[in-house]
């Protein structure tokens, strides 16, 4: 089969991949990913592409929310979500996830993975050691809360940090963030224990807080003053990065070029066209191998170093080694 695929032209593989993803989506496989991104065929696993120094030379801005699997996704995929779980259920769900991530006889990051029961038990024990200090094993809701963090860390945070590290190690400029601000309209319809869910920052970056966003009931999506203030800051960062490819600046007034295009009239005395109330934003440090800095985006943003280091070590180093039956 592999020999036959190698004889196929890339265009045909790309077209077939798109059709395959559509079929999988129709069957409910919403998280199916093929070897094609934006119409380009990936000749190797993304991790190997980085290691082979074949990744594109581009500046990279990437990040996550502080509760990626907090509410939106588990509510869709887990029946009875929000009622609490037992510790056995916590570990069973993580085992099922690991069994899907490391299927039998697949080479990934230089390792060969198997579905051996002992491996899964060792992985579950490692997860429990890292996360157990943060939950009460006798509290079903605390267990479910910690499950959402463990699952989100594995699915979103660890891959993001891994890519940031590999791209920075290749000498590229990388800027990492953890979103810590949820729009008021989203927070109002979630339990109070949910943090910043998957894609919460999208509304802030897009300037939705300054637009009339209609709801199905005929009203407009409400936004508060903190929403608008945070949105201005995020748009300032993103607009500057889009224009210059960098966020390496001293605390200064960053003109909102993209924002001004659709909201503010041009000022003849100011060729940039930025609004008069462009926000003061703190410096966003570059992420490097020696200084894995990241920005904590909030009403008042601040920088820090090392995003969940113990948990990232678990997902990106400890578990891959535990899952490997042998190293190639």
Predicted regions mapped to residue ranges:
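Substrate-gating cap/lid region and adjacent catalytic-acid/histidine neighborhood
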Residues: 4-228, 237, 258-265
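Alpha/beta-hydrolase-fold serine-hydrolase catalytic core, especially in secreted/extracellular enzymes
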Residues: 40-41, 138, 142-144, 158, ...
